[in-house]
């Protein structure tokens, strides 16, 4: 095997019928974790149901159905390999909670793959005011996914098939609006593909002889190639934030006989080690970490991306809960927020939102009602320039700077400092009505319990 490949995460976005499932299914199918037996089983079922033409998407539909029913399917199924990377598809839209997942997402996407359909009338429908293409691309950019690849799909459906003119027309149009959102188009690869027939997916297609390939220019190195898989291979690897202060949002807290209290969560930034003194915000509890485990193995250190359980002394299960955040007591420990100011983009709210609105916010693992205390200004989504001071209300499509107050103690951070703790989804009426990125936080100074174990550990030092 040699050296382990780097793991990267991608999110696949685009309008409902653009062929996301087929394209993604094709990659997983050809380069991925699905074994031949499963594929043959799927194909047989698809044929029996008269869905022969649907095999790649069918693979994905089967996986999605299992995922939605809460069957934890083997995550390997959502992975595929390129020459350089192990790629995990962290979510594909169409999934009910896609937007929420993308924000509170267990992991940040390193790159978004935008699929647009080239078929007659299809591209126009996807990019129209109420199509999802713009919304998804805007979301990806707002949430800090700065690398983008565009797959111009269904090239077999253009008139004439594999039309260069149609590809160029779409490329021009998409470039113009992703540029408005904030993407640098020089660094975006455009690839004409057929997710169904496989053109330019893994091998250059003889049907697009006019296509000379994609080129990207960026300060971290230029790249070029002919296919979608090569474009994925040219993604810049993420820098994992080990040099930042520790932030570990708790997913659960267990009581384990003979061991004690074991909080579980994913290290978002920094490093967690046994022997460390940790503070849990917003409760300001401080104690010592006795041990750290991942997949039932003891670790000497846990790094960003690791899902771990760690044993803490002198703290009962009742004192900790999901949504609390653990940090290093000696290095920028996390604190509860009195209030915070965020840029909020309203996606789909049926009415007007005004001061006093109190929906539930999902931020990292926290799920807490927060009050829109003061809508300070409306702003242009792209430039961030103020368009109206102290507006009475905001509605779908608006972006605004808002001061929010949590109704219960809550730990959040500025997006600039700790991205995973600085983006949130606003949930109301069982849907995501808005998304936000936190600009600044007013912290509370809370005096909390310091356990005996922590005091002892401090004396030793």
Curated annotation (Swiss-Prot):
Region (G2): 70-74
Annotated binding of GTP, by residue: 14-21, 91-95, 153-156
Keyword Transferase found: no
Location in or out of the cell: Cytoplasm
Region listing for G5, in residue ranges: 194-196
Region (G3): 91-94
Region (G1): 14-21
Modified residues (5-glutamyl glycerylphosphorylethanolamine): 301, 374
Domain tr-type G: 5-242
One MF term in the entry's GO annotations: GTPase activity
Keywords: Cytoplasm, Elongation factor, GTP-binding, Nucleotide-binding, Phosphoprotein, Protein biosynthesis
Annotated function: This protein promotes the GTP-dependent binding of aminoacyl-tRNA to the A-site of ribosomes during protein biosynthesis.
Identification of the protein by name: Elongation factor 1-alpha
Species in which this protein is naturally found: Apis mellifera
């Amino acid at each position: 095997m040699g050296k382990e490949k780097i793991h990267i995460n991608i999110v696949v976005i685009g309008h409902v019928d653009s062929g996301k499932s087929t394209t993604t299914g094709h990659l997983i199918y050809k380069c991925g974790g699905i074994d031949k037996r499963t594929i043959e089983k799927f194909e047989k079922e698809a044929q029996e149901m008269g869905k022969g033409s649907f095999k790649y998407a069918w693979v994905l539909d089967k996986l999605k159905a299992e995922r939605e029913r809460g069957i934890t399917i083997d995550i390997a199924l959502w992975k595929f390999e390129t020459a350089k990377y192990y790629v995990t598809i962290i979510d594909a839209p169409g999934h009910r909670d896609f937007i929420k997942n993308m924000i509170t997402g267990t992991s940040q996407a390193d790159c978004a793959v935008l699929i647009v359909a080239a078929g007659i009338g299809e591209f126009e429908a996807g990019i129209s005011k109420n199509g999802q293409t713009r919304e998804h691309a805007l979301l990806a950019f707002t949430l800090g996914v700065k690398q983008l690849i565009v797959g111009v799909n269904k090239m077999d459906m253009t008139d004439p098939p594999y039309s260069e003119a149609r590809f160029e027309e779409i490329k021009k149009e998409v470039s113009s609006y992703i540029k408005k959102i904030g993407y640098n188009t020089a660094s975006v690869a455009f690839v004409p593909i057929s997710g169904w027939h496989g053109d330019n997916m893994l091998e250059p297609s003889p049907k697009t002889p006019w296509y000379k390939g994609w080129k990207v220019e960026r300060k971290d190195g230029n790249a070029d190639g002919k296919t979608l898989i090569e474009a994925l291979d040219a993604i810049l690897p993420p820098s994992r934030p080990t040099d930042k202060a520790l932030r570990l949002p708790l997913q659960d807290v267990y009581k384990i006989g003979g061991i004690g209290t074991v909080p579980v969560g994913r290290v978002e930034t920094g490093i967690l080690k046994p022997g460390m003194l940790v503070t849990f915000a917003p409760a300001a509890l401080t104690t010592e970490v006795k041990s750290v485990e991942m997949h039932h193995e003891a670790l000497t250190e846990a790094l960003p991306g690791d899902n771990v359980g760690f044993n803490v002394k002198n703290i009962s299960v009742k004192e900790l809960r999901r949504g609390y955040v653990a940090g290093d007591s000696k290095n920028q420990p996390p604190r509860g927020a009195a209030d915070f100011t965020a840029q909020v983009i309203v996606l789909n709210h049926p009415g007007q939102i005004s001061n006093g609105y109190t929906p539930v916010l999902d931020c990292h693992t926290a799920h807490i009602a927060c009050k829109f205390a003061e809508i300070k200004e409306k702003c242009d989504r792209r430039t961030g320039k103020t368009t109206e001071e102290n507006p009475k209300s905001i509605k779908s499509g608006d972006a605004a700077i808002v001061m929010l107050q949590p109704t219960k103690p809550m730990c959040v951070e500025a997006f600039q400092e700790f991205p995973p703790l600085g983006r949130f989804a606003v949930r109301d009426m069982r849907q995501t009505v808005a998304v936000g990125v936190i600009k600044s936080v007013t912290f509370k100074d809370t005096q909390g319990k310091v356990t005996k174990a922590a005091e002892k550990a401090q004396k030793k030092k």
